[in-house]
Amino acid sequence: MRQIAFYGKGGIGKSTTQQNTMAAMAEMGRRVMIVGCDPKADSTRLILHSKAQTSVIKLAAEKGSVEDLELNEVLVEGQWGIKCVESGGPEPGVGCAGRGVITSITYLEEAGAYENLDFVTYDVLGDVVCGGFAMPIRQGKAQEIYIVTSGEMMAMYAANNIARGVLKYGHSGGVRLGGLICNSRNTDREDELIIELARRLNTQMIHFIPRNNVVQHAEVRRMTVIEYDPQNSQANEYRQLAKKIDNNEMKTIPTPIRMDELEELLIEFGIMEQEDESIIAKANATS
């Protein structure tokens, strides 16, 4: 069984990419479980055709404790037999959502949810790699990390920060960076830029996903593109990504870059002009 995690900046399309890729993986015959580690609890909606799956934390609060839960209450089987779980989190402004991730994964392990699987995938909130959200990395639950990014500055900034988190635990545990997934925003020279960022981070751009409105059309119907329009070229993009992950042999300890190196990269590719340096300088001063 391989345990992988998808990290990335909020709004980058991480959950959509993960669900479409795992749908393609299941279509290939792989036995898959998705564990949502985002308080929004939207990591499984396209597989289950639902607004949001009831989370482990919410059910535990209703029942009294996690120990009072039955596995079939929190683990739901969706399209292609994909097993789905949402860890959930507290109400906004109350408590640490990262603790929900820790509680949920511990419960799933003890309840035997990880048996007879080929892939377990964690969909993790990734603007910041705080202790709770880093739990799949920190405790070696996820062995392979895939960072969803784009040619936009803040998406690359987040990718570099996540790479720092992987590096921190890469030597002490078995976690490795499997690659960058470029979820295109149609920015200038985007594929070249992410290939170069990947090179500097000692990894690969494992796949470039072009922008296609069919993704939004499928999402509105709470479906993956694989299910909504299986013959569409975009469905084949996700199938290609699934095959690349399935066969991926390049798993590395990353080499995060400094903020001034990221700045130089953006200038080199014409994304940022010299006069914009103050933006990066301010970010650098607070990082």
UniProtKB/Swiss-Prot annotation:
UniProt-recorded name of the protein: Nitrogenase iron protein
Q: What is the lineage of its organism?
A: Bacteria, Bacillati, Actinomycetota, Actinomycetes, Frankiales
Q: Give the cofactor note.
A: Binds 1 [4Fe-4S] cluster per dimer.
Q: Which reaction does it catalyse?
A: N2 + 8 reduced [2Fe-2S]-[ferredoxin] + 16 ATP + 16 H2O = H2 + 8 oxidized [2Fe-2S]-[ferredoxin] + 2 NH4(+) + 16 ADP + 16 phosphate + 6 H(+)
Report which gene this protein is encoded by: nifH
The family database entries (InterPro entries) matched by this protein are listed as: NifH/chlL_CS, NifH/frxC, Nitrogenase_Fe_NifH, P-loop_NTPase
Q: Where does [4Fe-4S] cluster bind?
A: C96, C130
Which key words tag this protein in UniProt?
Answer: 4Fe-4S, ADP-ribosylation, ATP-binding, Iron, Iron-sulfur, Metal-binding, Nitrogen fixation, Nucleotide-binding, Oxidoreductase
Q: Which HAMAP family match?
A: NifH
As recorded in UniProt, its EC number(s) are 1.18.6.1
Q: Which Pfam families match?
A: Fer4_NifH (PF00142)
Enumerate the Gene Ontology biological process terms. nitrogen fixation
Summary of the function given for this chain in its UniProt record: The key enzymatic reactions in nitrogen fixation are catalyzed by the nitrogenase complex, which has 2 components: the iron protein and the molybdenum-iron protein.
Source domain of life is: Bacteria
The record's GO molecular-function terms, alphabetically, read: 4 iron, 4 sulfur cluster binding; ATP binding; metal ion binding; nitrogenase activity
Cofactor(s) named in the record: [4Fe-4S] cluster
Record's comment on post-translational modification = The reversible ADP-ribosylation of Arg-99 inactivates the nitrogenase reductase and regulates nitrogenase activity.
Q: Which residues carry this modification: ADP-ribosylarginine?
A: R99
Task: Please tell me the species this chain comes from.
Answer: Frankia sp. (strain EuIK1)
